[in-house]
Swiss-Prot record:
Zn(2+) binds at H562, H566, C665, H669. It comes from Pseudomonas syringae pv. syringae (strain B728a). Its EC number is 6.1.1.7. This is Alanine--tRNA ligase. Belongs to the class-II aminoacyl-tRNA synthetase family. SUPFAM superfamilies: Class II aaRS and biotin synthetases, Putative anticodon-binding domain of alanyl-tRNA synthetase (AlaRS), ThrRS/AlaRS common domain, Translation proteins. Gene3D superfamilies: 2.40.30.130, 3.10.310.40, 3.30.54.20, 6.10.250.550, Bira Bifunctional Protein, Domain 2 (3.30.930.10), Threonyl-trna Synthetase, Chain A, domain 2 (3.30.980.10). Transmembrane segments: none annotated. Consists of three domains; the N-terminal catalytic domain, the editing domain and the C-terminal C-Ala domain. The editing domain removes incorrectly charged amino acids, while the C-Ala domain, along with tRNA(Ala), serves as a bridge to cooperatively bring together the editing and aminoacylation centers thus stimulating deacylation of misacylated tRNAs. Its cofactor is Zn(2+). GO terms for cellular component: cytosol. It catalyses: tRNA(Ala) + L-alanine + ATP = L-alanyl-tRNA(Ala) + AMP + diphosphate.
Amino acid sequence: MKSAEIREAFLGFFEEQGHTRVASSSLIPGNDPTLLFTNAGMNQFKDCFLGQEKRAYTRAVTSQKCVRAGGKHNDLENVGYTARHHTFFEMLGNFSFGDYFKRDAITYAWTFLTSEKWLNLPKEKLWVTVYATDDEAYDIWTKEIGVPAERMVRIGDNKGAPYASDNFWTMGDTGPCGPCSEIFFDHGPEIWGGPPGSPEEDGDRYIEIWNNVFMQFNRTADGVLHPLPAPSVDTGMGLERVSAVLQHVHSNYEIDLFQSLLAASAKAIGCSNDNQASLKVVADHIRSCGFLIADGVLPSNEGRGYVLRRIIRRACRHGNKLGAKGSFFYQIVAALVAEMGSAFPELVQQQSHIERVLKGEEEQFAKTLEQGLKILEQDLADLKGTVVPGEVVFKLYDTYGFPMDLTGDIARERNLTLDEAGFEREMDAQRVRARSASSFGMDYNSLVKVDVATQFTGYSATTGSASVVALYKEGQSVSHLNEGEEGVVILDITPFYAESGGQIGDSGFLQAGDARFDVSDTTKTGGAFLHHGVVASGSLSVGAQVETQVADEVRDATKLNHSATHLLHAALRQVLGEHVQQKGSLVDSQRLRFDFSHFEAIKAEQLRALEDIVNAEIRKNTEVMTEETDIDTAKKKGAMALFGEKYGDSVRVLSMGGEFSVELCGGIHASRTGDIALFKIVSEGGVAAGVRRIEAVTGAAALAWLNSAEDQLKEAATLVKGNRDNLLDKLTAVIERNRLLEKQLEQLQAKAASAAGDDLSSAALDVKGVKVLATRLDGQDGKALLALVDQLKNKLGRAVILLGSVHEDKVVLVAGVTKDLTGQLKAGDLMKQAAAAVGGKGGGRPDMAQGGGVDAGALDSALALAVPFVEQGI
């Protein structure tokens, strides 16, 4: 069976069993702020399982698209090198929300897998696991389904804690949970590996193909499991894995779905279609990239966009490794659409968009990849040892745009590892430099000298026609810019707004026949507007006629935020006083940032008042008025001017809400205040002495922020078994209970220390008439060790004591010397030696000292220093 046939068979089978076919949700989780990407079929049903959402059906079946790259579930570094790791995969799943339970779920799974009508897998090839104490599931499998006991495996708590098992599923530390039952397929003795639960279980012979999760408990904060009133079922079967089984292959990359993508990848790259890891990387990555872009993710330097960029660049690097010349990755999109478009129509609808995004990102990366690879090869040739230094990894990241995992791929091919800690140190240092940077960097704008006054038409237009007046590359005038080159374009007329007054410059593109210049930013020097960007295709020359196009969506969102800053400024003067002056701002399409003079933190009630005032003006939906006048007339009308801003003879006065807000401003704004829709403050804090900062969102971004806050509130209420009305009371009770438990724990630890003291005193050695006790008590904190040393000094008399512990991944040390010995031996001196041995520091009084370190493996050696310390000191 082909993969598409298996997908449809699964959906059809469960429809026959009364399930509602539900479309795959977006890869961008719509109801879970804790997830970077959708990574399981149950994600879209989370609220159903929690009882917070009721749907028209109680049985559902889906084929869910999933991505695991970045965050907790990150398979990126393994992709291409193993048979089953992917950045994108399909999860077939059937779900019951308080409807059927174990018996039906198990019966459905077995019927679909083994019935001649459906997959017709040989029963003798299937193994089943259950949670160790789930006798109900075990009996159903053995007594009703007929799976022999020798192919049944009970899996206990194999992860070091109660209910921490491969066969016990939890949504979190609290909440719905329950045992699960996994079905494995035996690929045969020619493949290495053992059954689940055996020492060889990590081999490839026995592969899990289906997991049935039985949500029958609710785990409370105290760890107790309480039966759910309406148990549910959540199952998942990887389409790629079951396709491999049915197509009699042992690697997911050998299934029909991947064979077409591998062939298309090889064709686009111009290489042979053989079993190369790099080709598998490309074929895998086109799926995750295509689906992510179709769902609205774009390459960027943060969040989901950065993960997408990493995947694209990893694919490009592996393509180049196989000999790709020029852009190739975007060419594989057509094969992806042909293979999966019928099941996921968004691929068909977004095909051209996906191709444009991939081509643009690939071209941008290609400009620096070759040079970066040469630098890396040079550094690796000079490398001594097997660890690539953090500064090398950072240089590639910072200068050439190499994500760390891309450098890691190259290093792994040479059996090298990365100094990740060193990389993080370099990143921290860069952040410090960025905060302190001012005007010391190279400013190519200052090198642009052109006697041109660009005519600005952007107040009323976002498109137009213009002539190229001048071109600059790295600050030097040039006659043309070729494809792939970055530069600055100056036009005689433009709708692009140049960065000013805190509003970012416009982005978009310039088109001249086959030539296209992508504008990433617009600035101004003198009267000239500088369009910064890169030639995406063709060649652009001075004198060329171009069509201009501002990015409308970015412009629209930015102007709403800009108008909101004016309303906020006026509201601040109302609430805080007339002393408030704007000290700076940054307005882009995502949010607004407003710095202002004020002498203290703003109180919560003042923040609420600010929001109320601004939103009241928004609801009035008054027209935003502009007027060109001279500076003196504007000031007489009460227009506020920015401190330190230079104004010409003619100024633009912007009024909102009549006289509510009147300011001098040359920026782009909303037509009416109602266009802003909603205003929400998301943060307030100090940035300098006497300067405060407010960050806020508007419109759709504000609504998204409120929805996220509501989701988090619901999550918090669920964790404490409360609701919105009693959440504070519940949290107060939890905090008080925790305080009491901590007090009880301290008392128990004191008792345990006392008992331990009795046992330990007999282990002391006699060294030159001094009792010496040096031992480790892992798990004890410093407070407990101090109490124990005090007790031991009383018990032992003339003594030197050194106790150590590994507590929360750190070494804790306490040393004690009885007072009759402090003239000869000092606890602080002993502690300095012991702490240094574990990579730390320590010190204290002559009779008592504390210290610690990070090298737990050296703790025993540190404790061994006590005896020679006494021998040398007496």
